[in-house]
């Protein structure tokens, strides 16, 4: 059983389990937490359907913070000067490198910001003072943090990583995919995917990272359409509801560790095939590149979320309905 709280319309939808059987008598009382807290005096008007109970709530909408929380920010990782953070391969736990200083990149697309900045300044003069076009050069001790990746100095990973097909970065010990190429980065920096590594033995599920990336890009570019890609496969997604508190009786996300229900999610409409209205001239779809392993995990989460709804709520036209859990710092 799954319940969703539609914040802006003041309604809770309680979806019955797709395997629920119709028994014409009361066999038990079931306590189920709703994804919001109400006083006992709040009027509730239930609308009962074959597979859904709609609760119309006569109270002001509950407000939620619009802050986008991103896994592993600099403030979370920086420690005393004498203590370094250890980075390991998530799959085989092999040591990759250690970092003593972390800095946040200013934007999901920081190179575009630099290009814009260079167009509005005395470029040759500034470059001669700074020694080059990039202000974000990782060192052996300092790494930079993006929304979904860690920018590391390539030389500090010597002997620990190797380039595979399509210039993807792989672990030299277990061949797990660690990073994705990006020709906008500095020549001595490589991107390690946050979902492919452990930092101080902490790991982050790919769905949290992709959810943060979707919300960040949505906020920055006012777009709602994204393509999650691993180089060969694609998931076409619409960010339908950016903030959806849900409660569940049995978690549809068996591969992720959650705090107690309710949790905060993004409600997505998604397809594994190219949408029928897509044309090559469409420029409002934004790519979110992920590793092959992360793609499999995200596909699994979306499918499990979809199957937790009754059949009548699993699709919206040709689109499937899915959920991605949002990250909160209390999770690590």
Swiss-Prot record:
Entry protein name: Uncharacterized protein C1734.10c
GO biological process: co-transcriptional mRNA 3'-end processing, cleavage and polyadenylation pathway; proteasome-mediated ubiquitin-dependent protein catabolic process; protein autoubiquitination; protein monoubiquitination; protein polyubiquitination
Source organism superkingdom: Eukaryota
Organism name: Schizosaccharomyces pombe (strain 972 / ATCC 24843)
GO cellular component terms attached to this protein's record: cytosol; nucleus; ubiquitin ligase complex
Signal peptide stretch: none
Molecular functions (GO terms): cyclin binding; ubiquitin conjugating enzyme binding; ubiquitin protein ligase activity
UniProt cross-references to PANTHER family, sorted A to Z: E3 UBIQUITIN-PROTEIN LIGASE E3D, E3 UBIQUITIN-PROTEIN LIGASE E3D FAMILY MEMBER
């Amino acid at each position: 059983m799954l319940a969703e709280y539609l914040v802006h319309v003041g309604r809770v939808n309680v979806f019955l389990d797709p395997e629920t059987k119709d028994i014409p008598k009361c066999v038990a009382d079931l306590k189920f937490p709703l994804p919001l807290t109400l006083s006992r005096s709040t009027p509730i008007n239930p609308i009962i359907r074959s597979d859904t109970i709609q609760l119309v709530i006569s109270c002001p909408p509950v407000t939620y913070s619009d802050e986008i929380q991103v896994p592993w920010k600099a403030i979370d990782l920086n420690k005393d000067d004498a203590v370094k953070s250890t980075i390991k391969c998530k799959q085989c736990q092999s040591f990759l490198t250690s970092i003593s200083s972390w800095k946040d990149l200013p934007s999901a697309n920081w190179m575009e910001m630099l290009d814009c900045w260079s167009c509005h300044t005395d470029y040759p003069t500034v470059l001669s003072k700074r020694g080059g076009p990039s202000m974000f050069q990782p060192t052996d001790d300092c790494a930079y943090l993006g929304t979904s990746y860690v920018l590391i100095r390539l030389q500090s990973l010597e002997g620990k990583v190797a380039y595979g097909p399509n210039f993807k970065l792989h672990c030299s010990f277990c061949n797990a995919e660690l990073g994705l190429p990006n020709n906008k980065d500095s020549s001595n920096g490589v991107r390690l995917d946050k979902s492919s590594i452990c930092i101080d033995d902490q790991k982050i599920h790919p769905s949290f990272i992709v959810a943060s990336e979707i919300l960040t890009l949505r906020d920055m570019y006012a777009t709602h359409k994204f393509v999650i890609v691993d180089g060969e496969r694609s998931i076409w997604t619409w960010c339908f509801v950016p903030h959806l508190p849900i409660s569940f009786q049995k978690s549809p996300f068996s591969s992720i560790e959650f705090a107690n229900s309710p949790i905060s999610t993004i409600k997505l409409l998604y397809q594994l095939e190219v949408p029928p209205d897509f044309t090559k001239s469409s420029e409002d779809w934004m790519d979110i590149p992920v590793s092959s392993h992360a793609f499999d995990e995200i596909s699994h989460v979306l499918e499990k979320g979809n199957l937790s709804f009754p059949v009548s709520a699993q699709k919206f036209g040709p689109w499937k309905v899915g959920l991605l859990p949002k990250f909160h710092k209390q999770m690590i």
